[in-house]
Each structure stands twice: as structure tokens, then as C-alpha cells.
């Protein structure tokens, strides 16, 4: 069965390269530009994993993760932060809120793919 991923990031170049890479890995890919868009998609789709930026307009990644973790139907969905926020305190906060992994930008697409595959297979 095809795995589903929701990519949440406000940087179009990042979204495009990740979307392409995950489609090549036979993922069904959903895209949101911020947390509120992501939460809207999550009302209709239950992805295997959400790849989530933190610094976004409207609803940020921390708020989005909190809402995801409050939703019972998403309890099996893995959430991975992919963000430029790389201080120890940022990482600690992300993991305390319930992220399954915390990855930082800049990144290698190959590494992101392998980290995600490790979580969902």
C-alpha cells in the first residue's frame, strides 16, 4: 500500500524538491504552506507521516504539532520537524511536544528520505 506524507513548509523550493523525491519513493504526497492549511488537510487525510517546518506564517509548527497530538485519529501519524531552528532548546521543545524526529536545515534529500522510510517501514 502506498504510504502518505504531508509536507508542511512555506518555502516552495523545499516543497518541490521533497515532493519530487517522495513521489519517486512511491509516496502519496500532500502539501500545505502553513499549519492552518495542514490542519485542514488532516481533517480529510490521515498520512503516515507529517514533515513539518516550525517557522511559518499563521499557525507555526509547534502549534500544528500540538493540535495533531490532541487528535485521536492521528495518534499513529509520525511527525518529523524539518527546520532551521537548530538550538538545543528548540530541539528539546520539539521532542517534548511529541515530534518523532527533529531534523535541521540545510539538509540532504537523501538523508530525509532515509529518516522517513525508517519511521514508516
Where are these regions (language model features)?
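Two-component/phosphorelay signaling modules centered on CheY-like receiver
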Residues: 12-30, 119
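Alpha4 helix (beta4-alpha4-beta5 surface) of REC/receiver domains from two-component response regulators
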Residues: 19, 63, 86-103, 111-114
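Acidic, metal-coordinating helix/loop segments flanking the phosphotransfer/catalytic sites
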Residues: 31-49
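Acidic catalytic/metal-coordinating carboxylates
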Residues: 33-37, 60-66
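His-Asp phosphorelay/catalytic-motif detector in bacterial-type signaling
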Residues: 46-48, 73-78
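Receiver (REC) domain active-site loop signature in two-component systems and cognate sites
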Residues: 56
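Receiver (REC) domain switch/active-site region of two-component response regulators
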Residues: 108
